Regions:
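Local cysteine-cluster metal-coordination motifs and their immediate loop/turn environment
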Residues: 8-26, 35-39
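Non-heme iron-sulfur electron-transfer modules
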Residues: 25-55
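Conserved mixed alpha/beta catalytic, RNA-binding, or beta-rich assembly cores of soluble enzyme
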Residues: 29, 81, 92-221, 227-425, ...
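N-terminal amphipathic alpha-helix/helix-capping segment at the start of soluble metabolic enzymes
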Residues: 1-9, 45-110, 336-344
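Alpha/beta catalytic cores of nucleotide-metabolism and tRNA/nucleoside-modifying enzymes
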Residues: 1-6, 34, 38, 44, ...
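C-terminal amphipathic alpha-helical "assembly" element
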Residues: 436-438
């Protein structure tokens, strides 16, 4: 109701919702944007628009880095714990290059970063950003590296140096691409502040193990009108200092969300790359970098700078991030239907599964990778896996028949065998499905990875 009173109340449906009350509900759950209401954009509603924007603003400020389709948004969180609502903007992973690399190595590494992708539960997991580090402290050399990187990729950039002259040389090349500059400290803040104002880019504030100074920097930058800030309280990758780092992240996030300290309610940066400063062995360094990045993906790291691009480091980081930023309010599901896997014909098997995304893509992958031409009947189980759906009644004989009817799939007409194959975990439905559909029903393996061996013994049906 608090949100509703700022809406026009005309119920025109121009926003895509039937009523303003429905639109208000969508605004609260952050599935719609106030700019989708054309009436709010009129001058007569200007004051209400401003007040509503303040009311709906997330507890942690959102900061946009980059431009175009590849731009990333960090922050924007409203809760300390995901189960209370959800987390909205996944941790942005930036991988480093440096200005003393040979040109061929630089371009090769940039391409590896921007081209990496891993298919996982219906989507591709990718890397988000590139952090360009100045190891030469030479403005011209840094500018040359920034130029080469920007010509090779359109991923958002972080320009990394404590030397304002070096940062300026990079901004002269890519200042119009909204990079994040790293970093302002208690020693260089005046010059970095001037750069942020001149180029209108977001800036990281760095104060290791000193939250009071970090807050002071944040207040100072805000007084100059700079709102797009990222906080780096320092990342120490081992021992008691790792615990202190962990505590500082929690203190910052709690201050922003639960204590309403808006002057420090900004995205937090972690730098797991620091593991490479204390471990000489590359495998150990990569291992601890992955450990640290995992810790702060779970606990309030909105953006990270990392080094390891080996699959053994990337996969756990990306899989963890994807799971942490899954919306617990919505089952991870796929559309119901009857899907052709490969090039099925009248002799091909007809498998049944649930529409829980992880189940579906596992089954689909097992069928595709083993070149099993088949039909896959996907039943709407409210995004619940097979075993739980059978127990809860979301997967039953009636629903299987309804799915076949809805998608006009006549098994007897499409196939010569008139048979469907249930998952092993749905074996108890066999008799009911036979009675409901009039089809022959077989029970497959409990795990779709066992389908090839099951096929050898049981297909075609005798």
């Amino acid at each position: 109701l608090e949100v509703f009173k700022y809406l026009p109340g005309t119920n025109t449906g121009d926003c895509g919702e039937a009523t303003c009350m429905a639109f208000a509900a969508r605004l609260i759950e952050r599935s719609r944007d106030i700019n989708e209401c054309p009436h709010l954009l009129k001058d007569e509603f200007k004051e209400k628009y401003i007040e509503l924007s303040k009311l709906l603003a997330p507890e942690i400020r959102e900061v946009k880095i980059g431009v175009g389709d590849k731009a990333v948004t960090i922050g924007g969180e409203d809760v300390m714990y995901r189960h209370k609502l959800t987390f909205f903007n996944p941790t942005a992973y930036a991988f480093d290059v440096w200005d003393t690399m040979a040109e061929s190595e630089l371009i090769e590494r940039v391409n590896k970063i921007q081209n990496f992708k891993k298919f996982y539960v219906g989507t591709f997991l990718t890397l988000d950003m590139i952090a360009i580090r100045s190891t030469s402290s030479n403005p011209d050399q840094f500018a040359n590296t920034v130029k080469k990187v920007s010509e090779t990729t359109d991923l958002p950039l972080i320009l990394c140096s404590f030397n304002p002259d070096v940062l300026r040389s990079g901004l002269e090349i890519v200042g119009d691409k909204n990079p994040l500059i790293y970093a302002a400290t208690k020693d260089n803040w005046i010059a970095v502040k001037d750069l942020a104002l001149e180029y209108k880019v977001p800036v990281t504030l760095f104060s290791p193990m000193d939250l009071d100074t970090l807050k002071s920097l944040a207040l100072t930058f805000q007084e100059f009108g700079i709102k797009d800030l990222v906080l780096d309280p320092g990342t120490y990758p081992s021992g008691s200092q790792l615990k202190s780092t962990f505590d500082n992240f929690i203190k910052l996030r709690r201050a922003g969300i639960e204590e309403d300290q808006k002057d420090i309610a900004f995205p937090i940066m972690a730098t797991p790359i620091t593991a490479w400063m204390i471990h000489e062995d590359p495998v150990s360094a990569s291992y601890w970098e992955t450990v640290v990045s995992s810790i702060f993906t779970v606990r309030y790291g909105d953006i990270m700078i990392l080094h390891s691009i080996e699959p053994y480091a990337l996969l756990p980081e990306l899989h963890l991030r994807d799971n942490i930023y899954t919306d617990p309010r919505k089952p991870v599901s796929v559309d119901a239907g009857v899907n052709a896997i490969g090039n099925p014909d009248g002799e091909s098997p007809v498998f049944v599964t649930a529409n829980f995304a992880l189940t579906y893509y596992t089954v689909e992958s097992d069928l595709s990778s083993n070149s099993i031409d088949s039909y896959l009947v996907v039943v709407d189980t409210d995004g619940i896996g097979v075993e739980s759906a059978v127990a809860g009644g979301q997967l039953n004989a009636k629903k299987i028949k309804e799915t076949l009817d809805k998608f006009d799939f006549d098994v007897k007409e499409k196939t010569s065998h008139g048979t469907i194959v249930l998952p092993g975990l749905a074996a108890r439905l066999q008799g009911d499905v036979e009675d409901e559909t009039g089809l022959r029903v077989m029970v497959g393996p409990k795990d779709s990875g066992g389908i090839p061996k099951w096929m050898e013994k049981n297909w075609p049906p005798k």
